[in-house]
Amino acid sequence: MLDFVNDYSEGAHEKILQRLLETNMEKLSGYGTDQYCESAKQKIREVCECPEADIYFLVGGTQTNATVIDALLEQYEGVVSADTGHISTHEAGAIEASAHKVLAIPHKNGKVTAKAVKQYFADFYADGNHEHMVFPGMVYISHPTEYGTLYSKKELEELSIVCHEYDAPLYLDGARLGYGLVSEENDVTLADIASLCDAFYIGGTKVGALCGEAVVFPKNNAPKHFMTTVKQHGALIAKGRVLGVQFDTLFTDNLYFEISKNAIKTADTLKQALKEKGYTFYIDSPTNQIFLVLEDERLKELEQKVAVSFWEKADDNHTIIRLATSWATKEEEIKALIEIL
């Protein structure tokens, strides 16, 4: 059985496992205060070109989003997101559980536009009863999006301008950031993201790490007592070294970017073969997620040999599925899948 369900099925890159083993018996301070966390932070500051950045290592994506959003918002505020955004669809109401509403707006290929965001803010403040409503306090985006699509630098610049106009932080979810950054269609760098966003995170869980995400407040702008908020959300681990060693390794010799390239390379190979075979794509994704529209009978046959991710029903007789490659996908797996398809 081949498995293309997601990009976090494997454990971790061998270099990470090697470093975890090499440092295993060292006695280190806890909660992210060890030398490896500090080394990783410095390397991230360098690649992001933001020497004053505040950086924190959290355990996973949902915890990270819930923690950052809760820390950035006032009690009466919510977060603007695409209706397809991860916080709106696949985080079990984690944002709402911290008493903040997700203010969903229509997406365009998984993205929100500066025009739509500006219109939302303008409509809100034009309403004479807006004091009785949930205030839009920040904007959430992801790069890549849930559809594997990417924001251009121009789009980020436009969003940043709107957010500054309304004094609303722009927060970027980077769960799959490595895959986005190495895509041929990407024109955004980590330095660009650090310049245009008020907060973002660099995903490790889906890009070669066992677990962990690196939260970056690029302008020395972490919310007051942010570590306490991290603790309250259960996103702080005592053995912070586990995350520090992993990110220190990922940002040594460009490992994070090099292993990300494998996901794009294998996805591109698969997409080309699918195009040649005449398959119907639901959306054109330039990263590691491929969305196909299949007849239900064909899907039943495929699922006997390949594990895929259900996305949504296209109509009564067709289903949209997702195939995901990763840093660990082997060429042999792609060849085998192409033969089956």
Where is each model-derived feature located?
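Conserved PLP-anchoring active-site segment centered on the Schiff-base-forming lysine
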Residues: 71-89, 118
